[in-house]
Design a protein with these regions (language model features):
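Residue-level hotspots at or immediately adjacent to binding/recognition sites across diverse folds
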Residues: 2-23, 29-381
Length: 381
């Protein structure tokens, strides 16, 4: 104890020890914190264990592209679904766009026949659904209409449905749907007609599109254009505390009380986590991930450049984000991110930040004790 006291007394006279140690701690801490600023919880692989490229998932079902074609799994059952395009959770069961004209697939309804086996119900004649979304008892579907898409609506449970199909101008390609309080937001792209404003007649440009759809149950679904952006396509729609977020390959927009704001972020895929944040992923070689949290946008650095061209992203009930796509050799690839690790106290960044604070408090306490002792003894310091 006498040695420690002599060291403190010597330090109180010269103040060299605290300043030296504190300077070293600041330098080392800055280096370590910068090193630890990479996004935490990133690792290879996915919670969706299939041998192929995941196209969609819902509940216990996974739709994926394998070497043998498109397949769909549900628990331990696996089936060929060569023309399937979508999966959607609805009222405790899973709906599937299986590519069969006039029919939608479903599983997990609790009945003896269809709880573990895919069944189908009618959606009307001459319609093939590629996307589906339920809102209450109303079912909205994206259906094929020649080379374009249209929207059709039916009541769930109708024995002989007579779907109402929307009438619209232009060539629509619709990929995502999100139920709202009074209808749906639908996103995708609008394709310009041939020779539109001097464009290439063989490959007219496609522009990001968000539309609002309402249905009164009697007439065809009503369409209102919410946003038409630059060349690209909307691939994600998400609910936030204040409104909605639409993510696209050209831009990301927020929709709050009917007001549209550009966020200036492009992405290949996006997902909303369990904390209400929206994660946006770029293409192969991207070094960062953009995360929208309310009105704030943070850019997180990945531990290494992205090795995947993302095509599908999901987030499970534990907050684990799985990114699926292809690598630079066009082989299936996946990676996962723990969305809760970014702000976790036990993350490397959190531990280093806490350690830096504790060491700083210790050093300042020693300096304060020395100042107190010097004042008590009437010494000049």
């Amino acid at each position: 104890m006498s040695g420690w006291r002599r060291l403190l007394e010597e330090e109180s006279e010269h103040q060299w020890l605290s300043f030296t140690v504190f300077s070293i701690i600041v330098i080392i801490g800055a280096v370590l914190i910068d090193w630890s600023s990479d996004l935490s919880g990133v690792h290879d692989g996915s919670t969706l264990d299939v041998d192929g490229i995941v196209m969609d998932s819902a509940g216990d079902s996974i739709l994926y592209q394998s070497d043998d074609g498109i397949r769909i799994t549900h628990d331990d059952n696996e089936n060929t679904a060569q023309y399937a395009t979508c999966l959607e959770e609805y009222s405790g069961m899973t709906l599937a766009c299986l590519g069969n004209e006039g029919m939608l697939g479903f599983i997990g309804d609790g009945s003896d026949d269809c709880d573990d086996t895919w069944c189908q119900f009618s959606i009307g004649e001459n319609l093939t659904a590629t996307q589906v979304s339920g809102n209450g008892l109303a079912i909205l579907m994206v259906v094929q209409d020649g080379t374009s898409d249209a929207l059709a609506a039916i009541w769930f449970g109708e024995s002989n449905p007579e779907p109402m199909v929307s009438d619209h101008e232009g060539n629509l390609h619709l990929d995502v749907m999100l139920p709202t309080e009074d209808g749906w937001l639908v996103g995708g792209s609008w394709q310009a007609p041939a020779n539109w404003l001097g464009s290439n007649p063989t490959s007219p440009p496609m522009y990001e599109l968000v539309i609002h759809v309402t249905w009164d149950g009697v007439n065809a679904p009503a369409i209102e254009i919410v946003h038409m952006g630059n060349e690209g396509s909307i691939h994600g729609l998400f609910t936030t505390d204040d409104g909605y977020i639409a993510t696209g390959t050209s831009d990301t927009i927020s929709i709050i009380d009917g007001e549209i704001s550009s966020l200036g972020i492009s992405s290949y895929a996006a997902i909303g986590d369990n904390n209400g944040d929206v994660w946006l992923f770029g293409g192969i070689g991207s070094n960062t991930v953009a995360i929208i949290s309310g009105a704030e946008i943070s850019i997180e650095r990945l531990p290494e450049p992205l090795k995947i061209l993302p095509s599908y992203v999901t987030c499970d009930e534990d907050g684990m984000i799985a990114i699926h796509g292809t690598d630079n050799t066009d082989n299936p690839s996946a990676m996962s991110i723990d969305s809760n690790a970014r702000q976790s106290f036990t993350s490397l960044r959190g531990i280093l930040d806490l350690s830096f604070i504790l060491v700083s408090i210790l050093i300042f306490s020693i300096m304060g004790w020395n100042i107190y002792e010097a004042i008590r003894k009437g010494e000049v310091f």
